[in-house]
UniProtKB/Swiss-Prot annotation:
Residue span, VPS28 C-terminal domain: 109-205
Keyword terms of this UniProt record: Endosome, Protein transport, Transport
Protein's cellular compartments: Endosome
Keyword Ribonucleoprotein applies: no
Superkingdom of origin organism: Eukaryota
Keyword Protein transport tagged: yes
All copies of domain VPS28 N-terminal, residue ranges: 1-99
Subunit structure, interactors included: Component of the endosomal sorting required for transport complex I (ESCRT-I), composed of ELC, VPS28 and VPS37. Interacts with ELC.
Pfam families linked: VPS28 (PF03997)
UniProt organism field: Arabidopsis thaliana
Function: Component of the ESCRT-I complex (endosomal sorting complex required for transport I), a regulator of vesicular trafficking process. Required for the sorting of endocytic ubiquitinated cargos into multivesicular bodies (MVBs). Mediates the association to the ESCRT-0 complex.
Protein name per its UniProtKB record: Vacuolar protein sorting-associated protein 28 homolog 1
An annotated GO BP: protein transport
Length: 209
């Protein structure tokens, strides 16, 4: 006696699609583990992972009414494929692409902070040249510079510029807002800024190239 697993063609297609979805998730889980264990090269991993993601997106779109939640589907069939679910549902791109994007964002962010530091150095030095030596004029500029230097992770805590700006901010905080730097103080501050700027530029990666 023949046992039917489905009642009609539509139900048969549904089960076939379920089986295919199951296979894609399982294959992705195996691929993720192989990549983590260095059993496959990054380029091979990326090619295969991209194929699985494309197949998954196409299939899950056609099954969205029957399988609205992939995580629940995986739980129902006791798949234990958390890496695959993350890759297919949450990330949607191969790990190699994800890592490149993160590195690019980090580089872009660092470049932005470097530009901010340079701008703050130049603004602070220019203001002294223009004889803007009142405490309420100098303090905000040095405060901005100090904050931008502290945002740059490549600079060590004992970086010359960080220490000198902290010393100057402490000195200025003990003065009145309308007090002005003496000619000697202004000259020393400009020297410290210029020295710190040169050290800053030398500390940047590839500064010597």
């Amino acid at each position: 006696m023949e046992v039917k697993l489905w009642n009609d063609k539509r139900e048969r297609e549904m089960y076939e699609n379920f089986a295919e979805l199951y296979a894609i998730i399982k294959a992705t889980e195996k691929l993720e583990k192989a990549y983590i264990r260095d059993l496959i090269s990054p380029s091979e991993y990326e090619t295969e992972c991209q194929k699985l993601i494309v197949h998954f997106k196409t299939l899950s779109a056609s099954l969205k009414d029957m399988v609205p939640n992939i995580e629940r589907f995986a739980e129902t069939y006791k798949m234990d494929c958390s890496a695959a679910v993350y890759r297919l549902v949450t990330s949607g791109v191969p790990a190699t692409v994800e890592h490149r994007a993160a590195a690019s964002a980090s580089t872009s962010s660092s470049a932005s902070v470097v530009a901010e530091c340079v701008q703050n150095f130049i603004t602070s030095m220019d203001s002294l040249k223009l004889n803007m030596v009142a405490v309420d004029q100098v303090y905000p500029l040095l405060s901005d510079l100090s904050a931008s230097l502290n945002k740059l992770s490549i600079l060590p805590p004992d970086f010359e510029g960080k220490i000198k700006m902290k010393e100057w901010l402490l000195r200025l905080s003990k003065m009145g807002a309308s007090d002005e730097l003496t000619e000697q103080q202004a000259r020393q501050l400009h020297f410290d800024l210029e020295s710190s700027y040169n050290s800053f530029m030398a500390a940047l990666p590839n500064a010597g190239n």
